[in-house]
Amino acid sequence: MNFKKKRWHCLPGQPITELDKQVMYWENKGKLVPTRDMIKTPEQIAGIRIAGKVNTGCLDAVAAIIRPGISTQDIDDVCMQYCKDNNAVPACLNYEGFPKSVCTSINEVVCHGIPKKEDILREGDIVNVDMTLSVNNYFGDASRMFIVGGKTTPEKEQLVRVAKECLEIGAEAAKPYCFVGDIGHAIQKHAEKYHYGVVRDLCGHGVGLAMHEEPEVLHYGHQGTGMLLVPGMVFTIEPMINM
């Protein structure tokens, strides 16, 4: 694939760095490379880490209440209160009309489930809680999967385990000067080993200064394809698999 317009530009008046050399090398070979504004500064990364830490705390607060009998609205209430207590803004609230602060997806719902008083968690349900928030205009995005009551069917237990393994394997593939396709390839290979399908309509994405940024991180694909990964890029890996 050849891109007529160059995406990478060296800083005027500055020496060419190893990063410049690597990116220009791959761009000259016809690979898709990031633009310079996709590379976060150390200060920006520090702010994103703070947002990520607050987001982790929010999911920890959710973990403390997950049990049979609560509603997904109860989860939303906890997330809203946690954001208020920690000077954070729930990014999902009113995003493209989404009415709640968090996504709660039960069993066959892949993602973006809307919390409701009527949606009561039952023993053996699997529920994904997907939270994005901002702190001082920096964004953190993460989700966590729960088995309600701690026990479910062997089929659901394996699905949850393999999904987590896909995340870990995808993260291991995210190395400097590799490609987004390397991540997707690793995830797809592991999921298909257990005869699961990878959801293709949704993907990970860049994050940090906004809720959704470049690049799109597909959870399937081929090695050596997609955008070049370089130090300073920040993105989510959120594999979704199904039986």
What residues fall within each predicted segment?
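Active-site neighborhoods and metal-handling regions in enzymes and metal-associated proteins
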Residues: 1-243
